[in-house]
Amino acid sequence: MSAFSEISPQQAWQLVQQHAAALLDIRNETHFALAHPAQAFHLSHQSYGEFEMQYEDDHPVIVICYHGVSSRGAAMYLIEQGYTQVYSVTGGFEAWERDGLPIERIG
């Protein structure tokens, strides 16, 4: 895969439930703590090394942001780093919440 694919929040959740992909939330720490998709990994500059240790380059990854814009850039970056199956969630966390998909809160 030389480019990422866009998927709906429902498609993303289905892949996560099947343990077929890792869900990476790139929103800031405050917003992630307030609410994030269930089972999401908070991907930041600080946690990137941990992410790389947990997931091989061929493991499917799904990137989610606020509205589905920033995740595209992050998806391209992951492809440039050698990840081969990368997806971006259309509409971001806003669409995830609107669709009533599971969320978690910290604290």
From Swiss-Prot:
Reactions that this protein is recorded to catalyse: thiosulfate + hydrogen cyanide = thiocyanate + sulfite + 2 H(+); thiosulfate + [thioredoxin]-dithiol = [thioredoxin]-disulfide + hydrogen sulfide + sulfite + 2 H(+)
Main localization of the protein described in the UniProt heading: cytoplasm
GO cellular component: cytoplasm
Domain annotation Rhodanese: ranges: 17-105
Alphabetical list of InterPro entries matching this protein: GlpE_sulfurtransferase, Rhodanese-like_dom, Rhodanese-like_dom_sf, Thiosulf_sulfurTrfase
Subcellular location: Cytoplasm
SUPFAM superfamilies: Rhodanese/Cell cycle control phosphatase (SSF52821)
Top enzyme class: transferase
PANTHER family hit by this protein: FAD-DEPENDENT OXIDOREDUCTASE, THIOSULFATE SULFURTRANSFERASE GLPE
NCBIfam families membership: PRK00162.1
Family label: Belongs to the GlpE family.
Function comment: Transferase that catalyzes the transfer of sulfur from thiosulfate to thiophilic acceptors such as cyanide or dithiols. May function in a CysM-independent thiosulfate assimilation pathway by catalyzing the conversion of thiosulfate to sulfite, which can then be used for L-cysteine biosynthesis.
Protein name per UniProt: Thiosulfate sulfurtransferase GlpE
Organism: Pasteurella multocida (strain Pm70)
